[in-house]
Amino acid sequence: MNMFVDQIKIEVHAGKGGDGMVAFRREKYVPNGGPAGGDGGRGGSIILKVDEGLRTLMDFRYHRIFKAKNGGNGMSKQMTGPSAEDTIIAVPQGTTVRDLDTGKIIGDLVEKDQELVVAKGGRGGRGNIHFASAKNPAPEIAENGEPGEDHYLELELKMLADVGLIGFPSVGKSTLLSVVTGAKPKIAAYEFTTLTPNLGMVMLPDGRDFAMADMPGLIEGASKGIGLGLKFLRHIERTRVLLHLVDMSSEDPHQAIERYRQINKELADYDPELLKRPQIVVATKMDLPNSADNLAAFKADLAADKTLEKQPEIFPISAVTHQGVQQLMQLTADLLDKTPAFDSESHDKELVAEYRAAAPDKKDEADFTITKDEDGTWVLGGEKLIRLFKMTDLTHEESQLRFARQLRHMGVDDALRAKGVQDGDLVRIEKFVFEFIQ
């Protein structure tokens, strides 16, 4: 079964930077050669990239955790470790990316081959060549690689189509799509046959073409989530022209106008801007009995509606006999020629911000936090402090002393004293425990 998946949650973990190296030159004719430890390589980033061949988020159903590789460690003779390759994740055109931690939309992937960095790889740690000084010409200090970014994301697919087919269930949307595009949607004589959007390309004899999407039937309350409404109303947002199909074969001559108004109400309740889209009213099933009389009643009901600023254009067709179908496609193409393309820059412009995966904003970042465990151990945390800790090579005493100086400079020692920490109290940073000494 070709299941349509249009919303999924994933984890992305960028690679850690490679560790810097502590090394010294050992050459026959170079006495006191000095430090020669190289830097670590950059960790791999996680990048989402538009793949026009994809139509759903189905590939993410069983693969939701993505990890990039770590950078290579620095080497002797001042050689830098290799940087890791970025991990490229293919997504369908029309994918919106939301950060689940902040709730913000961080990217909208609508262009061909568009890329979005969603987790930046850590930079490589510096080797000991960077820490040489007049006072310490042979430092045994090197940095560990910076941790890569971790993010929890929600991907939401809004199908990109030039034309959207809307209407109540079983008005003939799937039949029309199959006739004009060659697509093979599931078609049957009962409601809700279409449970997923179907997409096809219309190719006209004059060389023009456009993408057409068959949206599952809407019902009353769709804008409030009844039926499949909310799930598929989002796909209509990006269509440029709407073909509103109305079934003319009912025994009730006034059913057509009631359903026409109901669909427009659901569109308005979901997003009033949708009613501003160019809309062609398509009277379907004109080959069946009662259809001609019902069409006349439908036109009369519209003419009597004083709330309409403009009478909609009505185009009768029969998808089964192909009556009027080619002319409808020509009319649709003409309307598309006059309708601007979907503007991803302006759509939700106040909500969408291109995510640049930059370093954290130092103004908003808490330098450190101090808490106390039930066993009496003091616990240091905070994004900046933890990042410094992870980049400290604790296997070398000089690196430990440098980290202690960094903590003192950040004000951690004074803050611990203010909290009442005494000599000999245990202090923990992640799994590393040490004694506090005044």
UniProtKB/Swiss-Prot annotation:
Residues given in the record as GTP binding sites: 167-174, 192-196, 214-217, 284-287, 318-320
Any single Gene Ontology cellular-component annotation: cytoplasm
Pfam families given in the database record: DUF1967 (PF09269), GTP1_OBG (PF01018), MMR_HSR1 (PF01926)
CDD domains in alphabetical order: Obg
One GO BP: ribosome biogenesis
Similarity-based family: Belongs to the TRAFAC class OBG-HflX-like GTPase superfamily. OBG GTPase family.
Protein name: GTPase Obg
Organism phylogeny: Bacteria, Bacillati, Bacillota, Bacilli, Lactobacillales
